[in-house]
Amino acid sequence: MRIEIRKDGNSTAVLISFDMDCSKFGSSYERNKFFRGLYGWEQVIKKNNSVYHYHREGVMNEVPHIKVDNSVFIVAMEEMQRVLDYFDGWENKVHWKTFQVLLTPDEVRLLEKKANESDLSEE
C-alpha cells in the first residue's frame, strides 16, 4: 500500500499507530481487556452439550478502517475522534501517534465500502 502525506483534499484520512507499555499493565487480563475493547472478541459458551458463539463488538467494529499492521490502521478523518476517545481511557499504558495521509481512489472506495457495511449491520 502506497501512502502519501498531504494536508488537504477529499481523500485524506488518518493513520493511527499505537504501542503499549506492557510494564504499566497490571496483568495479561487488563491487556486483553484493552484489545477486546478495541477489536472485539468471540465468546464461546459450552452448555448442555451445545456450543454458543457470541461476537462481542469493539470500537473498530463500529469504525470503518483499513488495517495496515497489528497496531496500525487507517480511518476516515471524521472517525478519528472515536478511536482517540477509546485510547484516552488507556493513556498511561498505550501511546499513539496520528499521521494525516492521502488515500488512493481504491483505498477511498474500500473505506466507503466498509462504512456502508457498518451502516447496514446497525440496522
Name each model-derived stretch.
Residues T12-C22:
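Active-site-flanking beta-strand signature of metal-NTP-handling nucleotidyl enzymes
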Residues R31-G37:
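Domain-level signal for Mg2+-assisted phosphodiester chemistry and nucleotide/NA-binding surfaces
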Residues D21-F25, E79-M80:
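Short acidic, S/G/P-rich loop/turn micro-motifs used as interaction or catalytic elements
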Residues K7-N10, P64-I66:
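Short, flexible turn/loop "capping" segments at secondary-structure junctions
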Residues N92-E107:
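Conserved short beta-strand edge segments in small beta-sheet-based binding/regulatory domains
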Residues G40-N92:
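Short, intrinsically disordered low-complexity segments
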Residues R109-E123:
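Short, low-order "capping/linker" segments at domain edges
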